[in-house]
Swiss-Prot record:
Keywords from the UniProt entry: 4Fe-4S, Iron, Iron-sulfur, Lyase, Metal-binding, S-adenosyl-L-methionine, Thiamine biosynthesis, Zinc
Gene Ontology MF terms: 4 iron, 4 sulfur cluster binding; carbon-carbon lyase activity; zinc ion binding
Record protein name field: Phosphomethylpyrimidine synthase
Cofactor: [4Fe-4S] cluster
Record-level GO BP terms: thiamine biosynthetic process; thiamine diphosphate biosynthetic process
Primary role: Catalyzes the synthesis of the hydroxymethylpyrimidine phosphate (HMP-P) moiety of thiamine from aminoimidazole ribotide (AIR) in a radical S-adenosyl-L-methionine (SAM)-dependent reaction.
Reactions catalysed: 5-amino-1-(5-phospho-beta-D-ribosyl)imidazole + S-adenosyl-L-methionine = 4-amino-2-methyl-5-(phosphooxymethyl)pyrimidine + CO + 5'-deoxyadenosine + formate + L-methionine + 3 H(+)
Co-factor note (free text): Binds 1 [4Fe-4S] cluster per subunit. The cluster is coordinated with 3 cysteines and an exchangeable S-adenosyl-L-methionine.
Organism from which the protein derives: Anaplasma phagocytophilum (strain HZ)
Binding site for substrate: N197, M226, Y255, H291, S311, R312, G313, D352, G353, L354, R355, E391, Y418
Listed pathway(s): Cofactor biosynthesis; thiamine diphosphate biosynthesis
NCBIfam families in the record: PRK09284.1 (NF006763), PRK13352.1 (NF009895), thiC (TIGR00190)
Amino acid sequence: MHMNISEIYPSSNKIYINCTLYPDVKVGMRQINIRNSSQRFLLYDTAGPYTDCDIKVNLTEGISSIRRDWIARRNDTYPIRKAKTNSDARGVKALSGDDRVILKGIAGGAPVTQLFYAKKGIITPEMEYVAVRENALLEQAEAIPGLLLPTKTRKITPEFVREEVACGRAVIPSNINHPESEPMIIGRNFLVKINANIGNSAVLSNIEDEVKKMVLAVTYGADTVMDLSTGHDIHNIRELIVRNSPVPIGTVPIYQALNKVNGIVGDLSFEVFKETIIEQAEQGVDYFTIHAGVLKSYIEHTRSRTTGIVSRGGAIMAQWCLLHNKENFLYENFEEICEIMRSYDVTFSLGDGLRPGSINDANDVAQFLELRTLGELVKIARAHDCQVIVEGPGHVPMHLIEENVKKQLDFCDEAPFYTLGPLTTDIAPGYDHITSAIGAAMIGWYGTAMLCYVTPKEHLGLPNAEDVKAGVISYKIAAHAADLAKGNPASFARDYALSQARYDFRWEDQFNLSIDPATAKKLHDESLPGKGGKTAHFCSMCGPKFCSMKLSKALND
């Protein structure tokens, strides 16, 4: 599959920046060519090969493994076996081939996690990659004449990245079995990131559709993708997604574990869950949402809620606890889970199984009891040299959002916060990409490191490709707005460049510098089509006599 970059991002091309510590490492960026000028504008690019016109991607073969040699050079892993694909896989058979070997950290040896290396003072290729990726945008901002930066630029160096990872304020999700991924960093001292959820259901299940959603999501800017499949072919869908994804892939393993016991919650066990996370770690999943903070004693606090327990994983574990009258087996066996995670460098995403699912339930006792427990689990994970982030709500009115961030930073020792929205009102089914983007922008400003998108289909059905696009774009806007509020110079540079184009009536540049150029151009051309509309010093809103910018330019002239 090859995304047509000239249609999605006109006047753009892919460039590669060489690293210094690791000269063989090249960082891909997208470059916009400013019309009638030698100027170029650099952008962070999450799309990997999909925005490189010189690379044709065949989804049945997977994308290139850029990290394979980096991992091999560390000499701390060993091959378990060659990968196998189920014989009934549709369109997946060619993926695993003879060349993919499943890796694991050497038995009895040190962890193979980015956190372990960082604590040892080692700057890995992954760390330099993310430093170059983020710092190139800061250098560009500093070099733009006339741009008034809100704060002094703090250079993002490989050493700064290492320090942030070492203290747990940032993570670089990098499973050793996902060498196709381009390193990215999640932490509040870096650009705010976004995640896109995809995956089938028992009602709608199609492998090809889910892979295309992933490609669409990363092309429009998703920094990570979660496969939340609960229907048929879970293993094969995930295989095709991981092998073709240039961004980290996350999952909620309890979904597949439940699928293995035919959907009967009472038949779940730690043994089934353990088998599932090993299977997924061997495939290359970069982070797992694990609902280990849903303790049996907390469940009673949800009984008076308006909407009860709305997390699927949280509801599954709560039901299991009550059926067996036992403590959550994910909590009870957490240290054993850590041993597995550190052998593959799978990052913990500690799930908020008791998050509020309605405005009336926001910031209640159950939510914050679980958050305290997640803070305890953060310390245990770090003691095992596992990378860890913490998930957050949910449905929260605007005036209660900041409290969530303050408590999370306090309870969870500044582990990166990863929130679903939050949705700021319950009254807009069909528009929850908007209700949640409002909350996402605010919580990102307050310090959340990654925002999980919400699509227009939230609460209504399984998102299709257009819903995925709408969700990603809504959240790219929210993340960018948060970065502006935090004073990130890279974000100010893009606003400045677009505003200059707008004031100069450079319509094509204005389209191309936007988050969704095709939509901007389409809306403009509905009333002023053709070449003449691209040179006009007005739009159809004001016309030639009432355009404020045209009048303002006349004053200056």
